[in-house]
Regions:
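A late-sequence structural motif
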Residues: 9, 72, 159-202
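Flexible hinge/capping segments at coil-to-helix
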Residues: 56-95
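Central regulatory/effector-binding core of bacterial HTH transcription factors
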Residues: 1-57, 125
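Hydrophobic hinge/microswitch elements
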Residues: 32-37, 41-45, 50-51, 106-161
């Protein structure tokens, strides 16, 4: 499983599977999206819960949820009250970013590439919560899944910046080899994933 899915969807999935198939242990590896893709391609895992663009058309990918990625900052940030902030202006401020190879960073970098821009990170972390804490402390703008900072946003401790660019959304997929035999337990896992609650961050 990729990291954001592991934090917000995997507990429900794992719990439902344990109740449905109590005699089948579910072995789970949580890692960044690039390494999850490599494990699936190498047949080291049978099924992946994957965020963002599916890397290989050979895989069967079925969407089950999605989440928004936001530009978030403290309420006293210089850009906090501005409207339709140009991307180039946002990039002049310190950025707190996920590491390269993560689904969130890949979507962010792809958005900038569409505009011919690149970003330099002031902070880079595998831990989105560390980036939230950095933004709360005034270290800069964090670019993370909004679901991770839902409490801070609701309380007004962080605000969404109004960036003049396409909304950043990552879709979540269950991915597997279409020609590989699926046991009844694997088929049940797929069924559970496809019926899991999409969550408050579901993007219609």
């Amino acid at each position: 499983s990729c990291l954001t899915i592991a934090n917000f969807w995997l507990p429900e999935i794992a719990g439902k599977f344990a109740r449905a198939c109590p005699d089948t242990p579910l072995e789970i590896t949580v890692d960044i999206v690039s390494r999850v893709a490599a494990m699936l391609a190498a047949n080291k895992i049978d099924i992946a819960l994957y965020e963002g663009a599916v890397p290989d058309a050979r895989f069967r990918a079925r969407e089950f949820s999605s989440y928004r990625i936001g530009w978030l900052a403290a309420p006293d940030h210089p850009l906090a009250k501005q409207k339709q902030i140009p991307l180039s202006e946002a990039l002049r401020h310190p950025l707190l970013l996920r590491e390269k190879g993560s689904a969130v960073r890949s979507t962010f970098d792809s958005t900038l590439l569409l505009h011919g821009l690149k970003a330099e990170a002031r902070w880079t972390s595998v831990n989105s919560q560390a980036l939230v804490r950095g933004a709360l402390g005034g270290a800069g703008i964090c670019v993370i899944p909004e679901i991770i900072a839902a409490n801070e946003l609701a309380a007004g401790r962080l605000v969404r910046l109004d960036i003049a660019a396409e909304p950043m959304v990552n879709k979540n997929f269950i991915v597997y080899h279409p020609d590989k035999y699926l046991s009844p337990q694997a088929s049940k896992l797929i069924e559970i994933v496809l019926t899991v609650s999409p969550g408050d961050q579901a993007v219609k």
